């Protein structure tokens, strides 16, 4: 609904899709929009993702799963995803939106270019809902697909 409402409010015509894939929603939207641009289905796309899990139900679920950090006395250092002493994540809400555009189209209109997306890949491990497989096969396939595209 959000993508449809935004297109109506701002007169955004062309491909319109709302993808929901949990933590990867924003990344998947970037990849799908990039592919639409590469396939000449659009010159420019508005993409993003949002998450609001800080609700009683969301908090209760993550607490029951013991997924949240217990370092409540030091919230600034509680989030440490790559640390051997990590003990969970810090729950937060957020959103991000960006404009993706065909490079030639952006140059033609004099747009400020912040970065160029040169590939996208996605894959799944078929291992666990949140943990990657120990061999990293899904991540390797994802990177391989990004390099191919």
Regions inferred by a protein language model and the residue ranges of each:
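Glycine-rich anion/phosphate-binding loop at the beta-strand->alpha-helix junction
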Residues: 44, 49-55, 61-64
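Conserved catalytic cysteine-centered active-site region
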Residues: 1-32, 41, 64-90
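Short acidic, glycine/serine/threonine-rich loops at helix termini
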Residues: 30, 55-61, 127-132
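Condensing-enzyme catalytic core mediating Claisen C-C bond formation in acyl metabolism
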Residues: 73-149
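A glycine- and small-aliphatic-rich helix-loop capping segment at beta-alpha/alpha-beta transitions
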Residues: 36-39, 59-72, 134-138
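Beta-strand segments within the central parallel beta-sheet cores of soluble alpha/beta enzyme folds
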Residues: 16-21, 42-50, 112-120
